[in-house]
């Protein structure tokens, strides 16, 4: 169901930036307000320990919250 991936308007206090796997990002990028807590609805794999999904504009990032590193980037996830 394509509408499951339709995102609402996304506003962030920072500009869009493409993140690659393995890069470190600031904790403000994975603050609680940007977390995707209902990852099952989007058919995303269960995050591992100390990992969380966050929305960055139309992308979803799987981030290790202890290190700030991007584990997996899903670009263009929302439309």
Summary of predicted features, one role per range:
Residues 1-79:
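Low-complexity segments
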């Amino acid at each position: 169901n394509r509408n499951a991936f339709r995102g609402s308007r996304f506003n962030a206090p920072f500009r869009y930036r493409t993140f690659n796997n393995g890069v470190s990002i600031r904790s403000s990028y994975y603050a609680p307000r940007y977390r995707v807590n209902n990852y099952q609805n989007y058919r995303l794999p269960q995050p591992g320990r100390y990992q969380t999904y966050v929305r960055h504009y139309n992308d979803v990032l799987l981030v290790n919250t202890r290190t700030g590193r991007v584990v997996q980037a899903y670009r263009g996830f929302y439309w």
